[in-house]
């Protein structure tokens, strides 16, 4: 048992390091609405990684512009992203499958970032707008947007805006904001 646990943790750590390094090296970004194939690595003077705060930090609640409604929201994820994966798990636990639709991007992030290429068995393309790349979803928000293009994305189909792209916040949104719709009041957060 201990050996299996040790082996699993080392494999997991290796995958995360590989993923993180590749992700930050090859991932482009949107600058003033244009896809730029540049490194998005940011660091301070000492060389330590500095994460830029997300622009999309909205909440879904009865008191906000983004109200809890069935079939109003859509999730963009990659099975290659552990942060997106945990959001999918919460969606399942909170019985949101019938209320929040999902598109899965191709797991390989190439020079144009995440794609909706459907040659991966579980990638289903962009079912809302038929876009080719995930950055085009971000461009729908603003033609002058400057941001990294990440998953998961919680998308509002009604306003055509990104509600949130921080997995920890999407988890909390899913944990409580749709309770009255699903009648699932279990607290998983």
Regions found by a protein language model. Give the residues of each.
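GST-like domain detector, emphasizing the conserved glutathione-binding G-site
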Residues: 23-189
